[in-house]
């Protein structure tokens, strides 16, 4: 597998959109992380959609969000039911999914003083979380030589990340 594969589709039914995405992704047997973005129209079906995609692709780890629109490779979906998935292949143990909004969860591992490698973090934030500014402010310190990528969820009804 190439390190990244993209699949995206706009259909009225989530099943049809998901089938098109899986078809575009092709063989993902080496992928170990996927990013999923859906528009508001599919937000009520997100758990079914995610279950289907996990079963069809075999990708174990997923992160993403819901938005009013999705932009991907020369295509923009706005005000219509759409899905975009980026399947990724990373070295084992080179990434970690964490939820800093949950108090019982640990923060990302701190960088050691001798670690000069770039440590990117893809961050999705719930705009209703009053602690979000503080959580985001703490991330660079915890990441060390970190680089934050991402944004706030922009949805009309759900704020899943």
Residue ranges of model-derived segments:
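Cofactor- and metal-binding active-site motifs of prokaryotic enzymes
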Residues: 1-161
